[in-house]
Amino acid sequence: MILRFIRSCIRIPGFLLMSWFYVLALLLIRLLKAHDLKQLHGVLLHYIRNVYRLMGIRVEVQGKLPDEPSIYMGNHRSYVDAVLVPAKHPIVFVARSESKNWPIIGWGASLLGTIWVNRKDPASRKNTREAVKDRLRNGLGIVIFPEGTTHIGPDLLEYRPGMFYISAEGGFPITPIALEYQDPSIAWVGQSKFIPHAWKHFGKRYIDIKVSIGKTLTGKDGGQLLKTAHEWTAKEVLKLRKEWDS
């Protein structure tokens, strides 16, 4: 218990300070080289590696990443998920507009070019579609969690269909991804407060996760793309859960 307390005391303030440093680095790049995607992505990758080291995150990746930019769609368990999606190309996220004003994390996400979606705005789908086209044409991958919220699992919530139809209309490839933590309680769900939840889990020596990458999907039928991605991810998550429990 004492070691867990000490780790939490070091890790959480350390994470906030480190994140603030990287936000400043992103801001500097934006000011000096606004369109240098490689440098922005390099900062993100460097940040993720240091988050792993500081927070004791260990990731096992199964499967092969696509060679071309893709829309990566995964199940959603926790706030940790955002640093778990590997990519060969610079990536941006699709996220709820409510997260845009989060101190430090929201600011950094905006500097990386995150596509903010306002679900209450009727024009949101059109704006999102154009933003996705723009990012993919510029060689960026897109990361989205189509459940729309976190869920403890191991089952999946229904996927929100919007991005699948945008993908079908634009001919954008989709790569399904399955995430499963060794400890299911790391899922951030319900009315859990962030600080108590983070304090509990970042006090552990390690946080172990399996990430499985599926085959890239293309097609003109958004409903079929959704069905195929959801079915594969649901089966793969159950397989990963069995691996952890065996």
Task: Describe the function of each predicted region.
Residues I115-L136, G141:
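A membrane-cytosol interface segment of integral membrane proteins
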Residues P69-I71, G139-F145:
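Residue-level preference for the first positions of well-ordered beta-strands
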Residues M1-E60, W107-L111:
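A transmembrane-helix-recognition feature enriched in membrane-embedded lipid enzymes
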